[in-house]
Every structure is written in structure tokens, then in C-alpha cells.
Amino acid sequence: MKTKEIVDGVTMKRAITRMTYEIIERNKNLDNIVLAGIKTRGVFIARRIQERLKQIEGLDVPLGELDTKSFRDDVKVEENTTEMPVDITNRDVILVDDVLYTGRTIRAAIDNIVNLGRPARVSLAVLVDRGHRELPIRADYVGKNIPTSSSEEIVVNMVEIDDKDNVLLLAKEDSL
């Protein structure tokens, strides 16, 4: 596999900051927002958005962590480690993930959210949208659109877990 860095740490920071400004612009009542990071890297991105919202607007937006494994149609896991600090009923929930690909993880996250309560609205923020949807799901806030072939992979590294911020494109030797 060939590896190519397609987003560096500075570009990642800018993309998350831009997504935060878009969230501010599109939401009239920021006090009603709840961020829901999809484990694992989605939680880290959601925390960064939460920090930016605090810096820019002075708001403490609640942040939950969604475990989608028990809601997936391709993996059977009994334990659900979802943590949601507030009741999401009648709140505007913003799901946050690192990569949007087929849409299956997001479908599982929506199932999890509906299991927790009845939000007023659910929207989606992703750092990378790579295309290839299998379900009718689209992101409302996108850091980077990176079209890929189905044989390529996107890997998001985050300093919290990987000691570095970047996005890599992995491809078979003959594709890059």
C-alpha cells in the first residue's frame, strides 16, 4: 500500500475551525445544541468543535460519546458504552465523525440517538467526506471533500490517540 498525506495538522485545524463557524452561522439557538461524537475519533473532533465554540461564543455545549457497535447491522456487540450528559429530547443534536463513507456508521448512530430520546433535529458534521454512499445520508458540515476510489482508504490520525494530526490516503501500489 502507498501512503500519501492529503491533510496536514494545520489544514485539519482550519477545517475544524471552519466547521465550527458554519455550526454557529446555521444554528440560531446555540444553547439548544448537543454535540454527539461517534467513538473514537469522532469524539476527539467533537471535543475540538466544543473547545472552538467556547473560544468563539463563550458557550459550554454539552458533548456526548456515541458507541455505534451495538446498533450496526454488520457487527454484533451486546455492550453499549454510549455516554450522553444531557437529555437530548427537543435538542438539536450534531453527530460528529471523522470519515463519512457508506453511511452505515451514521445510520447506527441515528438509531442510537433515537434510542436515547427524541431530538428536535439531527445534523451531521464530518472531517472527511469520501463518497461511496450505500444509504441516503449526507453531511451538513464537511471539513474536506476527498473523492476516493473504493479500493482506497482514508485514515484520520489525531494527536489524542495517534500522536499526530493528519489525514492519509492509502492506495494499492498501482493507484497513486
UniProtKB/Swiss-Prot annotation:
- For the protein in the UniProt heading, the enzyme class is transferase
Biological process, per Gene Ontology: DNA-templated transcription termination
Q: Which residues form a coiled coil?
A: none
Q: Keywords in alphabetical order, please.
A: Glycosyltransferase, RNA-binding, Transcription, Transcription regulation, Transcription termination, Transferase
| Pfam families to which the protein is assigned, alphabetical | Pribosyltran (PF00156)
Q: Where is this motif: PRPP-binding?
A: 93-105
A GO molecular function term, named singly, is: uracil phosphoribosyltransferase activity
Organism's domain of life?
Bacteria
Catalytic activity of the protein: UMP + diphosphate = 5-phospho-alpha-D-ribose 1-diphosphate + uracil
InterPro entries the record matches: PRibTrfase_dom, PRTase-like, PyrR, PyrR_bifunctional
What NCBIfam families does UniProt report for this protein, alphabetically? Answer: PRK05205.1-4, PRK05205.1-5
What the record says about family reads: Belongs to the purine/pyrimidine phosphoribosyltransferase family. PyrR subfamily.
Purpose: Regulates transcriptional attenuation of the pyrimidine nucleotide (pyr) operon by binding in a uridine-dependent manner to specific sites on pyr mRNA. This disrupts an antiterminator hairpin in the RNA and favors formation of a downstream transcription terminator, leading to a reduced expression of downstream genes. Also displays a weak uracil phosphoribosyltransferase activity which is not physiologically significant.
Question: What's the protein name?
Answer: Bifunctional protein PyrR
- Organism encoding this protein: Streptococcus mutans serotype c (strain ATCC 700610 / UA159)
